[in-house]
Amino acid sequence: MMMTKQKNTLADRLNIGGEVRELRLGATFNPKNSSTAFHTIKYDFKPASVDPNRMAAVDVGSNNQVTVTVPNLENSGVPHTVYKGNQRKYAKECLMIYDKETGAITLEKLNHNIQVKKTRSEMTHHKPSFLPATNINHNNIPMSTNGSGPGPGPGPGSGPSPPLSGSASGSGQKLENSTMRISSKTKVSTGSRRNNIIDFKPRNSPMQQSSPSRPVASHRSPQSAPAWNANNAQQTLPSIPMIMDDDDFGLGAALHNGTGGGQANISGSSTGSSTGQPDYGGGGSSSSSTMHRQRQVPQHGQHGKRQQMHQNHQQHPSPPMHQQQQQQQQQQHYGRGINNGGGSNNYAQQQQPQQHHQQQEQQRPSSSSTYSHHSNNMPMDLDFPRENDLTSQTMAQAGAAIEEQIGGVLSASSSSSESDSSDSDSGSESDDSTDDESRPMQQQQLPNLGLGSISPSYNNHQQLQQQPPQQQQQQQQQQQYNHHMQQQHQPQQQHHHHHQQQQQQQQQSDMYTSNRGFPNDLLQNDLQLSSNSSDDDDD
């Protein structure tokens, strides 16, 4: 099929037809012929810019090297296209030539087979300018390329030809560009590496700790830790003397208290010291205070902060309205304790005179210890001399009025005590039962007054200390006289209620004196009640 197809195409192309024609041999078959030769050239690529109307030049050099220069179109921008290759001889290859005018067919013998490839040297028209550039580039190649050999030079040819020079210049230009790119890349790469090492190291890079260029950071890290520990040690030092002061004060207060449950409370309850009531749980308070100190030992910082907050609270005292409310609350608490547990006071009056004397002796050093406690822990109250002067004046006036009232009450009660003292003996059994109930209520009421009532309670305590000793002696004499009269007479149940009211009124008057006195209306009411009770006793 292939042969028939080729034959068909050949007959069609030549328009020979089916006729038999004569075949002639050409001059190449003549051995004496030396002027005519036929060669074949095979191109790998033929661009569209080649001009078919112009003749090409073939240059055959030594070692069968052939250079073919084909002209291009004028508008292509490149004047020539250069091909290079080699040649070899044909052994039994022929060429048939058909003449269209005469119709003759001639057979010629082929001499050489030439195969060429296109070279990329289109800038041949700048030959004079590029020749010295090529020499300079060849001289600079070993310097710029770090030991790399020069590029491949042009192949050997038969003399200087324009296509050859153009190709050499084109290769030189390529080498120049390549070496410039390589050198620029190496410079940029080395520069970027140095910048990475120098510039980015201080900016939190992972090489900052392991790099040998910064050994200072590694040496500074062990020195910073002891400095921090030293600072912490200095911060914990100020809390040690405060704990030692508390311990020393606790021991001093314990020595002042003795073995009997006195009035001084180490935990700082100012209400117990201001009211003058005995502390039935003195041993328990001292043990609780020691346990409280043991709990405070591992918390130095918190203890210091709490003291600072407490001092700030003391430096900013509450307004007068707040103090008045606190005083009213204290009066209500004491009124409840008297109404609910009045038997405790009767129980205290029914004790022997020796026990009263011992308790009073214990109250005096304990009150001094509580006063020292307040003076040590509360420097803020000493900053108000005006209030102290006013309270001292009011206490002096109230003391004088109370002495006159107590004298009248004693004269009125002396006539009725003979008939009324027996009633207290009959009610002593009931009072003993209520005494046990009044003690826990007093213990519950005392801790309810916190740090908010320290300043008024401290003033009340100072007022108690400023009372005249004559008033205290009169109260002691009254208690001893009542106790002596109670043991001598028989019980009478008719006037027992009036006698309890009289005792409660006396206790309330004592409580009001401890709280900066009481109004004149209450004094008049007490005098009227006492006079009424004396009239009832006479009836």
UniProtKB/Swiss-Prot annotation:
UniProt modified residues of type Phosphoserine: 205
Compositionally biased spans, kind Pro residues: 151-163
Claim: Transcription is one of the keywords in the record: yes
Subcellular location(s) of the protein: Nucleus
Region (Disordered): 119-539
One GO process term, biological-process aspect: positive regulation of DNA-templated transcription
Residue ranges, compositional bias (Low complexity): 267-278, 309-337, 345-375, 461-493, 520-533
InterPro entries from the UniProt entry: EAF_fam, Tscrpt_elong_fac_Eaf_N
UniProt GO MF annotations: transcription elongation factor activity
Acidic residues composition bias: residue spans: 420-435
A GO CC term attached to the entry: super elongation complex
Residue ranges with Polar residues bias: 132-146, 174-195, 220-238
Source superkingdom: Eukaryota
A Pfam entry, by short name: EAF
Record keywords, A-Z: Activator, Developmental protein, Nucleus, Phosphoprotein, Transcription, Transcription regulation
The keyword Protein transport belongs to this UniProt entry's keyword annotation: no
Function: Promotes transcriptional elongation by Su(Tpl)/ELL. Essential for development.
Family in the record: Belongs to the EAF family.
Protein name: Ell-associated factor Eaf
Species in which this protein is naturally found: Drosophila willistoni (Fruit fly)
Name of the gene encoding the protein in the UniProt record: Eaf
